[in-house]
Amino acid sequence: MNITRASLPMLNTTCSCRREKWNFLGRYEGTFDYWIGLHRASSKHPWMWTDNTEYNNMFVYHMNAQCLKKPEEGESSPGTGGVHSYKILQRNSLRAISPESSAKLYCCCGVIMVLTVAVVALSVALPATKTEQILINKTYAACPKNWIGVGNKCFYFSEYTSNWTFAQTFCMAQEAQLARFDNEKELNFLMRYKANFDSWIGLHRESSEHPWKWTDNTEYNNMIPIQGVETCAYLSGNGISSSRHYIPRIWICSKLNNYSLHCPTPVPV
């Protein structure tokens, strides 16, 4: 699943609205609005996904229509002829919006169809050596249920609070450790997904005179300075802070998501 920051027309963006994915998207999308793959020809037609399967209105059904945002003054209301697409809004809701002109959407679709035909025709016309590909299965070890995969790691965000020691014990029971980040991408994900909660991570030290270490005793590289003079670290709204170990907080676990990938081998015929 990819969440883009670029502002683009709703052409090929898709969303599988299973409940667990909705919970993830609703929490992770932050203050931005995102296109998803629902559209319809007019207000008299049913909502469809981009593969032309009909939308089952699961959120209107389960959420008692609370997932449709009340339109602001001057906006088109759901049910009017100008409404054509859904998009995700902040605070776990869906909202119907009106494009500037339906003609623009049809024009874009027409351009895409023309380009697609041109590409196919060109690929057929170009001489190419026939090859037979021997495909070797790709084997992935997916993250466990309720864990989120980022890069080569799986992360778990607790739903309740405890002290640093119990949090580490819990993670170890899951064959993991309190969260470790090795680059800014992972840190940015953790900071964003933890929302407004202070969260224990796997950095600790014996005293203010000792260096910070991860739970495997490798030394922290001070990528981001840690504030305070205490012995256990947590993610806060201001970055990384330190605290005494007995303060109750939610926590984050992490472990490697090991997988093997075998690329297909082309064999000329």
Curated annotation (Swiss-Prot):
Q: What induces it?
A: Constitutively expressed in bone marrow cells. Up-regulated in vagina after 17-beta-estradiol treatment. Down-regulated after removal of ovaries.
Disulfide pattern: C171-C253
Q: Name one GO biological process term.
A: negative regulation of osteoclast differentiation
A single GO cellular-component term from the record reads: plasma membrane
Per the UniProt entry, the glycosylated residues are: N163
Q: Cross-referenced Pfam families, in alphabetical order?
A: Lectin_C (PF00059)
Q: Does the keyword Kinase apply?
A: no
Where in the body, by tissue, does this protein show up? Detected in vagina, eye, tongue, stomach and spleen.
Q: Can you name one GO molecular function term for this protein? A: natural killer cell lectin-like receptor binding
The residues on the Extracellular side of the membrane are: 129-269
Q: Where are the transmembrane segments?
A: 108-128
Q: Ranges for the C-type lectin domain? A: 150-254
UniProt keyword annotation of DNA damage present: no
Keyword set for this entry? Cell membrane, Disulfide bond, Glycoprotein, Lectin, Membrane, Receptor, Signal-anchor, Transmembrane, Transmembrane helix
Write down the InterPro entries for this protein, in alphabetical order. Answer: C-type_lectin-like, C-type_lectin-like/link_sf, C-type_lectin/matrix_domain, CTDL_fold, NKR-like_CTLD
Which PANTHER family does the entry link to? C-TYPE LECTIN DOMAIN FAMILY 2 MEMBER D (PTHR45710:SF35), C-TYPE LECTIN DOMAIN-CONTAINING PROTEIN 180 (PTHR45710)
Q: What is this protein called?
A: C-type lectin domain family 2 member G
Q: Which species is the source of this protein? A: Mus musculus
Q: What is the lineage of its organism?
A: Eukaryota, Metazoa, Chordata, Craniata, Vertebrata
Report the gene name: Clec2g
